[in-house]
Amino acid sequence: MKFEILNKFLIKSLKKVNNLITRNHIFPILENILLIAKDNTITLTSTNIDMEIKIIILDVTLLEPGSITVSGKKILNICQNLPKDHNLKIQYINNKLKIVSHNNQYLLATLPIKNFPNLKISENQNNFVISQNDLKDVLCATYFSMAIQDLRNFLNGLFFEVRNQHLYAVATDGYRIAICKKPLHNLDKKKYNSIILPRKGVLELIKLLNYSNEVISINISNNYFQIEFKNLIFTSKIITEKFPDYTSLILTHISKKMILNTTLFKEALSRVAILSNENFRGVNIKNDQNKLLITTSNQHDEEASEIIDIIYTNIKIKMSINASYMIDILNAIQDQEICLSKNDVTHSIQIQAHHYKIAPKAIYIIMPLYA
């Protein structure tokens, strides 16, 4: 294997594949990246068994094809400490990977490719396309509601389903739920698989996605979730458990509601929450005519209260909520005004953008600490 490449192109790709690499004393091969040189391209692959990132580099001068695995962290550190505009000469020779840059030379240990894991997606796939913009929107609107290491494993990820010509993303930790949908175009009429993408896969995907109109392909099988970009493929195992029904929790016909300024509500909550109980982060909200009272207290007999104006209301709300949950939602809503409505059956509170039809279509539900 022998090729030449401009350092800045190699660094850009090495950074992405290194996201999956951590210290691994049991399987040292997982600290390596798979490097394949063929057909005038270089392919870099990293994996942690549960996820895989594969990047194809076209800006390369291939002199001799070949493949090997090499430490991902070491090759990245070397390249980052060399000038970005240097042309690198890379060659596999005598079981070492040789990197030459002007008068500098480095020899890295390698491992054979036969032991490098390969995530094989099954043939039974559902495929559809979506823009990077739309996919990143639904992820950023929902990911913060995923559970963290819950015993109910189906909560430790993001639920995806294709329904009524839309992609739905749903996350819940049992105390709150986030739902966002985006329209899909040119869909077949076949039934699409619903899957749960694990938390780590969701967070990694958010890093990889850009706010771009570039169309990407989503492939869903019985065991994997895969995204294909122009020169990058991200694959993740899925959680093979049933996600709970969430549709019955949503208020579809909202006649009674409260409209608040998003920024004013968020800033007041942030200040009041400073003196809330550190474990429960509880704040009380209560409206009186066109004013909303936000109060809290803690075990040290400290108290805080603020009053903000209500833009419009025809309901009475009096409940205690987790301030951090509400602030997460307010940070995600891309509208100057929010709409609060109360579900009298579940005693939950539903939050969404007031201008729902033009803002990203996301709905949030929070269970009260006590009503």
From Swiss-Prot:
Q: Name one GO cellular component term.
A: DNA polymerase III complex
Q: Which GO terms describe its molecular function?
A: 3'-5' exonuclease activity; DNA binding; DNA-directed DNA polymerase activity
The protein's superkingdom reads: Bacteria
**Keywords, alphabetical:** Cytoplasm, DNA replication, DNA-binding, DNA-directed DNA polymerase, Nucleotidyltransferase, Transferase
Q: Which BP terms does GO give this entry?
A: DNA strand elongation involved in DNA replication
* CDD domains linked: beta_clamp
**Cellular location(s):** Cytoplasm
By sequence similarity, the record places it as follows: Belongs to the beta sliding clamp family.
**NCBIfam families (alphabetical):** dnan (TIGR00663)
Q: Give the quaternary structure.
A: Forms a ring-shaped head-to-tail homodimer around DNA which binds and tethers DNA polymerases and other proteins to the DNA. The DNA replisome complex has a single clamp-loading complex (3 tau and 1 each of delta, delta', psi and chi subunits) which binds 3 Pol III cores (1 core on the leading strand and 2 on the lagging strand) each with a beta sliding clamp dimer. Additional proteins in the replisome are other copies of gamma, psi and chi, Ssb, DNA helicase and RNA primase.
Q: What does this protein do?
A: Confers DNA tethering and processivity to DNA polymerases and other proteins. Acts as a clamp, forming a ring around DNA (a reaction catalyzed by the clamp-loading complex) which diffuses in an ATP-independent manner freely and bidirectionally along dsDNA. Initially characterized for its ability to contact the catalytic subunit of DNA polymerase III (Pol III), a complex, multichain enzyme responsible for most of the replicative synthesis in bacteria; Pol III exhibits 3'-5' exonuclease proofreading activity.
Record-given protein name = Beta sliding clamp
Species this protein is from = Buchnera aphidicola subsp. Baizongia pistaciae (strain Bp)
The major lineage groups are: Bacteria, Pseudomonadati, Pseudomonadota, Gammaproteobacteria, Enterobacterales
As recorded in Swiss-Prot or TrEMBL, the protein's gene is named dnaN
